């Protein structure tokens, strides 16, 4: 029996200043899977990711057509509360971006915005989220130190914990390891594989090795088109399109 997708993208196009940068993309995200989005720079991967939790709304020059259905309704309908949407569909960016405050306050930031003040609830959220991001043991004795003083890899895992604290169902990651050293990147990858048990993840990556190690499905983008999408193993072993094969084998990028 086929698993139902948790999110369905249909005929999504994104225009910047009337220029079509994402072209009629249709893609499903499935529960407890990691979907990798690959392709050269400027191919539309990050644009798609930012469309899934309406981050592109912050740019007045962007126009979007098509639909993204989550929880039974189109997230681009006027009745969507984007604040609530971004709690359920969290985002982790390329550069670690902890707030200039303590590790503890970074993690509870979203909960405080919701008006939660109960210390026991906040304490539990901090511990469970930092454990989920595989960094609790490294920071549990210095929760009130500045998050900015952590290493880049630790900062990125605190950013993941900050997303986890709002109890999302989907986590979007835009090249989350590209600014990190190989050891830190490896820890992030291990964390993502653990998170897959409880969440749905979509990751933009420029590393074919990372895509093959982490993802269940892969979508290949070229010049705004989703040229090919399917199970990662099948795509990497036997791509249907020559462009996909050329990109995966490093003939262009």
Curated annotation (Swiss-Prot):
Primary location class: membrane
Domain ABC transporter: residue ranges: 7-248
UniProt xrefs under Gene3D superfamilies: P-loop containing nucleotide triphosphate hydrolases (3.40.50.300)
Membrane topology annotation: Peripheral membrane protein
Residues binding ATP, per UniProt: 39-46
Subcellular location: Cell membrane
A Pfam match: ABC_tran
Entry's Gene Ontology cellular component terms: plasma membrane
EC class (word): translocase
Assigned EC number: 7.3.2.1
UniProt-recorded Gene Ontology molecular function terms: ATP binding; ATP hydrolysis activity; ATPase-coupled phosphate ion transmembrane transporter activity
GO aspect biological process, one term: phosphate ion transmembrane transport
Catalytic activity from the UniProt record: phosphate(out) + ATP + H2O = ADP + 2 phosphate(in) + H(+)
Keywords: ATP-binding, Cell membrane, Membrane, Nucleotide-binding, Phosphate transport, Translocase, Transport
Functional description taken from the UniProt entry: Part of the ABC transporter complex PstSACB involved in phosphate import. Responsible for energy coupling to the transport system.
Annotated family: Belongs to the ABC transporter superfamily. Phosphate importer (TC 3.A.1.7) family.
Subunit structure: The complex is composed of two ATP-binding proteins (PstB), two transmembrane proteins (PstC and PstA) and a solute-binding protein (PstS).
Protein name: Phosphate import ATP-binding protein PstB 1
Organism: Streptococcus pyogenes serotype M4 (strain MGAS10750)
Name of the gene: pstB1
